């Protein structure tokens, strides 16, 4: 997993301050760790968006104006329900030997058999919660969909544990992650056959 440096600056918590901050292209955020005081900061919206919308997860070195650097990861993001802009972010501090739970994006590889037969690949879970040490965290959880047929799904329990040594996927084992759906045309044809009256039946 790549480590990214992200500049942050301390901010004051005042009435309407967050809204004014957003108008300048900055996003209000907090930095916290168990047993430590929470730090209110601001971060550049453009730089933050690149991380939030990335297809990979990252460890983030938060760089303060005084040169102090704190290692962290994005724990939570709040979006505006209308514009979908990032309006607030939580950064959780982390040490090298600390076990954390982190949302890791899902990526697929291979050409699904079901897609070659006319189906449509659908990723149901775009990220999974992974538990482990920061240095062991993958950039993404890669799932091989080559053998996936139409109407079939790959569940959390079917993701090989050997692919992520020292890590544990915390999502429910029965959670479907990716599936192949029948095309609309094929689904309609199947329904037509199922609804047809057998010849001679009356």
From Swiss-Prot:
It holds the Pfam family Ribosomal_TL5_C. GO terms for cellular component: cytosolic large ribosomal subunit. It comes from the Bacteria. CDD domains: Ribosomal_L25_TL5_CTC (cd00495). Disulfide bonds: none annotated. InterPro entries: Rbsml_bL25/Gln-tRNA_synth_N (IPR020056), Ribosomal_bL25/Gln-tRNA_synth (IPR011035), Ribosomal_bL25_b-dom (IPR020057), Ribosomal_bL25_C (IPR037121), Ribosomal_bL25_long (IPR001021), Ribosomal_L25_dom (IPR029751), Ribosomal_uL5_bac-type (IPR020930). The keyword rRNA-binding applies. Keywords: Ribonucleoprotein, Ribosomal protein, RNA-binding, rRNA-binding. One of its GO terms (biological process) is translation. GO terms for molecular function: 5S rRNA binding; structural constituent of ribosome. Belongs to the bacterial ribosomal protein bL25 family. CTC subfamily. This is one of the proteins that binds to the 5S RNA in the ribosome where it forms part of the central protuberance. Part of the 50S ribosomal subunit; part of the 5S rRNA/L5/L18/L25 subcomplex. Contacts the 5S rRNA. Binds to the 5S rRNA independently of L5 and L18. This is Large ribosomal subunit protein bL25. It comes from Chlorobium luteolum (strain DSM 273 / BCRC 81028 / 2530). The lineage of its organism: Bacteria, Pseudomonadati, Chlorobiota, Chlorobiia, Chlorobiales.
């Amino acid at each position: 997993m790549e480590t990214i440096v992200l500049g942050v600056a301390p901010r004051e918590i005042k009435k309407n301050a967050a809204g004014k901050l957003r108008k300048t292209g900055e996003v209000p955020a907090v930095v916290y760790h168990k047993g430590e005081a929470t730090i209110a900061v601001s971060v550049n919206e453009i730089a933050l968006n690149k991380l939030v919308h990335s297809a990979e997860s990252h460890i983030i070195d938060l760089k303060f104006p005084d040169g102090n650097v704190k290692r962290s990861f994005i724990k939570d993001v709040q979006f505006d329900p209308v514009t979908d802009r990032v309006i607030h972010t939580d950064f959780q501090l982390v040490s090298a030997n600390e076990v954390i739970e982190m949302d890791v994006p899902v990526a697929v590889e291979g050409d699904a058999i079901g897609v070659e037969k006319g189906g449509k690949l659908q990723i149901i879970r775009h990220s999974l919660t992974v538990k482990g040490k920061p240095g062991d965290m993958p950039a993404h959880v890669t799932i091989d969909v080559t053998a996936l047929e139409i109407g079939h799904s790959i569940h959390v329990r079917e993701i090989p544990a050997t692919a992520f040594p020292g890590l544990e996927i915390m999502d429910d084992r029965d959670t479907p992650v990716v599936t192949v759906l029948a095309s609309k045309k094929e689904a309609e044809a199947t329904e037509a056959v199922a609804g047809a009256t057998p010849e001679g039946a009356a």
